[in-house]
């Protein structure tokens, strides 16, 4: 047998060659970075959105990151974009006065005045509007500004079950032997922020007010910041009438608010300056009226009358000490004045007698002297 001829594959048709070539070119073009590697240094590649040409669009990306950090869509409600180091920051520049003209925000929180509300809206970038003038009287909040789940307002979390109506975040423990309302309020994570409540007691923070309201199943509101003092009139610390309360539409109150004003008795606004002549003016929003806390020794609607009954009141130990010291100093001063007056009155007659004797001696004439001789 002769030599075997080598096998030869049939020649591919021209159309198949073109198809293979097109697939290879398309695959090479779609490889990541293949387009960027063929670009010359200094440009040629279109950046996303047709905003310029660069190798990797780094400059544009940097600018876009700054814009995304602070622009009109992310810095609203009175905020201003300002440079902060290498980037931009949304700054809320509100110079709020400290007058107590409380307003109720749409998030259920009470703010010291409308400026504080706008500043909170800017800081949290949330739409907060004024829904009522004066503090919020919510069904499940006491105006403490700690969130919609907190507070001791009337009718908060009423649950009707075997326990009866459980209010103020109390829950019915039906599995217990003694079925009743229990309070599972944990105040361990709250910082020390003493407040004076409407029951005349001081609490370490607003959370303990809610806990006491839950345990006692009665409404206890926060009157003012700080411990209760002797000047707090317990007659003014009564409970608010449920009929006077207002429940605004709550949008979002999950954040802590440091701009929230606490209490239902506030100092009067500037337009009521001089309302109390001898006392402190307080505005009670539950009645929408101003009242006066008169100083010691004064009475009347505007503290304009002198209270003479104060003369018969036994002062405290500290005040009694001051009274005794003042009495001793006054007695010493009176004694000194009396002594000076007595000395003057005693010396004057002697001087007068001496002057008269001298005058009489001067009246001797020459005739009287010759007679004596």
UniProtKB/Swiss-Prot annotation:
Keywords: Cell membrane, Developmental protein, Disulfide bond, EGF-like domain, Glycoprotein, Membrane, Repeat, Signal, Transmembrane, Transmembrane helix. The keyword Transmembrane applies. Disulfide bonds join 92-122, 96-115, 104-136, 183-214, 187-207, 196-228, 268-281, 276-292, 294-303. Residues 264-304 form the EGF-like domain. Residues 1-36 form the signal peptide. One of its GO terms (biological process) is host-mediated suppression of symbiont invasion. It holds the Pfam family Kazal_2. InterPro entries: EGF-like_dom (IPR000742), Kazal_dom (IPR002350), Kazal_dom_sf (IPR036058). The chain crosses the membrane at residues 324-344. It is a single-pass type I membrane protein. Residues 345-373 are cytoplasmic. It comes from the Eukaryota. Residues 359-373 have a biased composition (Polar residues). Its main location: membrane. CDD domains: KAZAL_FS (cd00104). Residues 91-138, 182-230 form the Kazal-like domain. Residues 140-162, 352-373 are annotated as: Disordered. It is found in: Cell membrane. The record marks 98-99, 189-190 as: Reactive bond. SUPFAM superfamilies: EGF/Laminin, Kazal-type serine protease inhibitors. Belongs to the tomoregulin family. May interact with ST14. Neuron-specific restriction factor that prevents herpes simplex virus 1 (HHV-1) infection in the brain by blocking viral entry. Also able to restrict herpes simplex virus 2 (HHV-2) infection, although to a lesser extent. Acts by preventing the association between the viral glycoprotein D (gD) and its cell surface receptor NECTIN1, thereby inhibiting fusion of the virus and the cell membrane. Also able to prevent the association between the viral glycoprotein B (gB) and MYH9/NMMHC-IIA and MYH10/NMMHC-IIB receptors. This is Tomoregulin-1.
